[in-house]
Amino acid sequence: VPTPSAARGIIESIYYHPGLKWHIDKIYVMNPIRFTSIRRNEVKNKISANKIMKEANGKGASYIDRKKDIEQRATMMLRNVHYIIEAHFEMTDQANESDNPGKFQDIITRRLRKGQGRYQPYLGTRECTAHFGLWEGGRIPTISETRDLGYMLYDLDFSDPNDIQPMFFRAKLENGVLDLTDCEVVK
């Protein structure tokens, strides 16, 4: 189940404006929670700026040594996920005079119906792209699972830019719904 901040990130990838702030109300889990394991070959080192400068000046060639610079990583990930995110927004003091909730709602609805966003959202890593649309099907058919998911990241507290703090909450899935409307957030 995505964290509330990840769900907000997905929504902001569809529509972001400094004049509004998103709040996640509920996350509906549509498909059973299932895991799969994958292995990936990844480059373990980045090329340094010095190597790039030497190559640009014709004093060397950069390459990746297959034996030294590539490592295999195992990942346990969710598979066949399907969520519905219920959210609302509030206007902020950065909204322009011409901004209003109706205008934002129309833009968001249009983008959701067309599957358009600012950039392609993803779940966890960019290889796990998220596809989205507007739910207009009435009752949401969630899984019938109730499970305590433990403490989960809620968001980051940016109120003090010199001391950004994580905020957590006790995540409880009730009949396939993670309800965030009245959860207790702790630092």
Language-model features and meaning:
Residues 42-44, 52-187:
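Internal, well-folded beta-alpha domain core
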